[in-house]
Curated annotation (Swiss-Prot):
Belongs to the bacterial gasdermin family. The lineage of its organism: Bacteria, Pseudomonadati, Pseudomonadota, Gammaproteobacteria, Lysobacterales. A lipid is attached at C7 (S-palmitoyl cysteine). Keywords: Antiviral defense, Cell inner membrane, Cell membrane, Cytoplasm, Lipoprotein, Membrane, Palmitate, Transmembrane, Transmembrane beta strand. It comes from the Bacteria. The keyword Cell inner membrane applies. It comes from Lysobacter enzymogenes. This is Gasdermin bGSDM. Disruption phenotype: When deleted from its operon, no longer protects E.coli against bacteriophages T4, T5 or T6. Palmitoylation helps stabilize the inactive state; may self palmitoylate. Palmitoylation plays a significant role in pore formation. The N-terminus has marked structural similarity to the mammalian gasdermin N-terminal domain. The C-terminal region wraps around the twisted beta sheet core, probably stabilizing the inactive state. The beta-stranded transmembrane 'fingers' of the active protein form by local refolding of several alpha helices found only in the inactive state. Reorientation of the N-terminus probably flips the palmitoyl moiety for insertion into the membrane. One of its GO terms (biological process) is defense response to virus. Disulfide bonds: none annotated. The keyword Protease does not apply.
Amino acid sequence: MSILPGCKDPSLSALKSKGYNVVQLPRADLRPTQLLVEKSKRLQRLGELLSVFDAAADGPPAPPVSADRPGPNIAGTQSADLDVDLGLSVLRGIISALGGSTLGVDAAFARAATVQFEFSSTLENNSELALIDRFLAASRVNPHARAVAEMLEQDQVYVVTSTLKAQRINVAAKDSNKQSLGLNLPVIQDAIGANVKIAAAAASGSTVSFEGAVPLVFGFQAVRLIFEQGRYRTMRLVDAGGVVAEAVRPDGAADGEPPCYLDVEAMLLDR
């Protein structure tokens, strides 16, 4: 899981090696076949396929999403050590997404100088590219979706094709001397409430696992849709690797798609 744009984070290489891009702040409600739109060099959620495209009466249905299945074995998915202020900001977002309370979290990590995150027991969902391609070729843009039609004509719309998620996230803390810091599990559990389970993920007590009822998506794959005169023409695969939304070039260079990065801060505005 990568948090900092532009930092050398080992998790980026691990996810990139499996063809995935990084969700900066993991979330539960990102899934395959959702549409994203590039706006001001950021990707924001646009809607579902059937919110924009009308399926042909004699054409293929909307592509299904696979059931949960074990994700790829990703070694080195630990994030870089984050300054405690930034790390706790991320942790509060994760705990909230898992269904817990964030009151008292800062006090539980009062002695920490840095925080590190790691995913465990990953799950994967996907929708077949061939089925997405067939559906788009046969369907039509809803005539009432005028703004979306303009976005499609400008090749600003993406389809999520695969997601990688985890129900358990490990958090480690270090003190100002970069030594592993023991964490008080009862204090943390009292702070976040019963909706999120915690347990020691290391014998030293310096790593705590947070587990909620709903897995959080931390990696994704997507394709960029290419339209011409209101009709779907083709799609372009989005290269894996990176976290900075500003790295997405809006012109879609002919020498291959650049890395595409999901900017979660922008997506949070859609809530």
